[in-house]
């Protein structure tokens, strides 16, 4: 979410302060699959202007530059989902077991639109939550150290007894697969 946070800082300086619900609505209304970036491209590590870095990437790869804020947001969300698919494929090659779903924890688990995009492109369920995974994990480790829970399995049972993660199932995988091919074509130019 680094790309989005940096864009938000620029927009805030320009007097455009968007809440997260507003950002999601903006992404929903933007035209899908118009432009893509590789979120891991080094140019996005700490540019003077994230919006200008995204525009330059699009220009250099022959894509239309985003103009409106909603176009930047949609580009970032779709590009993150496509990058997740690439990384998941790499993990699948080395994992000693088949990966059948993706778990998203922490703050990212609250972004329902990105989680749905991810489920669509990886064509498997995305299980989102808990959003406060670090704090919960810390509590569980302390409970284990105090002898209040026996092992990690008991920790998981306890956590699952009071938290219900959101599950996102794939939708429209055909159009997402076609868009992923376009993403691969664009990002392989760099």
Model-identified regions with their sequence ranges:
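Active-site core segments that coordinate phosphate-bearing ligands/cofactors
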Residues: 1-101, 110-134, 140-190
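Glycine- and other small-residue-rich loops at beta-strand/loop junctions that grip anionic moieties
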Residues: 107
């Amino acid at each position: 979410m680094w790309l989005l946070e940096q864009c938000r800082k620029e927009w805030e300086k320009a007097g455009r302060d968007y809440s997260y619900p507003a950002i999601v609505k903006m992404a929903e209304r933007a035209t899908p699959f118009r432009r893509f970036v590789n979120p891991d491209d080094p140019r996005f590590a700490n540019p003077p202007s994230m919006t200008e870095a995204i525009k330059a990437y699009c220009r250099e790869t022959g894509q239309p530059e985003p103009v409106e804020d909603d176009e930047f947001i949609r580009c970032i969300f779709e590009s993150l989902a496509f990058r997740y698919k690439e990384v998941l494929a790499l993990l699948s090659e080395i994992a000693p077991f088949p990966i059948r779903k993706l778990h998203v924890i922490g703050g990212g688990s609250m972004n329902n639109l990105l989680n749905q995009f991810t489920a669509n492109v990886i064509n498997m369920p995305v299980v989102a939550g808990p959003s406060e995974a670090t704090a919960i994990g810390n509590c569980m480790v302390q409970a284990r150290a105090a002898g209040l829970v026996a092992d990690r399995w008991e920790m998981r049972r306890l956590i699952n007894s009071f938290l219900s993660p959101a599950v996102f199932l794939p939708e429209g995988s055909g159009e997402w697969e076609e868009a992923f091919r376009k993403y691969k074509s664009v990002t392989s130019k760099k």
